[in-house]
């Protein structure tokens, strides 16, 4: 049905994932995007805070995922000589130029795509829903999991930010969210 959400492919439930991530201490230095986040934080986020556009001591967040299409097919090439020997359907290993990408469902366009899921937490009480914390995940990441990964990383990397309320859509409709 057009506009419907894809079923989660994760093997772990929200109920299992939430306490695991809540008790994980993420270190920005260990993240592949660490230097990019530091640049974002210093040049954009802190500027928004200093101008009074975002209030980190009483933050209302909205969160949602959006597709980031990187190609129309998997980017891979053979590392074997099978094609030279006339074997076209070998099962040999391949080299993937974007190994952290995969296939996901875009419910707003009603199609599959190859790439990432950008989960964005924004300041819903700011004039323009200014971004607070973005996180790229493989395209197959369901929003219910994308939020948890993004939220708990945000808490680790921005410890002085106090979240007062969170606005999420129906993809996040799981009892552990309400209980948290």
Per-region residue spans from a language model:
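Polybasic low-complexity intrinsically disordered regions
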Residues: 2-170, 175-178
């Amino acid at each position: 049905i057009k506009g419907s959400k894809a079923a989660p492919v994760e093997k772990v439930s929200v109920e299992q994932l939430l306490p695991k991530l809540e008790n994980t201490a993420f270190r920005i230095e260990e993240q592949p995007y660490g230097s990019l986040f530091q640049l974002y934080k210093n040049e954009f986020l802190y500027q928004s805070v200093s101008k009074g556009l975002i209030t980190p001591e009483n933050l209302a967040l909205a969160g949602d995922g959006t597709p980031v299409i990187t190609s129309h097919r998997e980017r891979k090439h053979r590392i074997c000589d099978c094609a030279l020997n006339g074997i076209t359907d070998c099962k040999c290993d391949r080299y993937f130029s974007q190994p952290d990408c995969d296939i996901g469902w875009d419910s707003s366009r009603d199609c599959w795509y190859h790439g990432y899921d950008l989960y964005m937490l924004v300041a819903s009480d700011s004039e323009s829903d200014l971004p607070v914390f973005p996180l790229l995940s493989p395209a197959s990441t369901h929003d219910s999991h994308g939020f948890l990964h993004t939220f708990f990383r945000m808490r680790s990397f921005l410890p002085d930010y106090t979240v007062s309320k969170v606005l999420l859509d129906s993809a996040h409709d799981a009892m552990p969210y309400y209980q948290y």
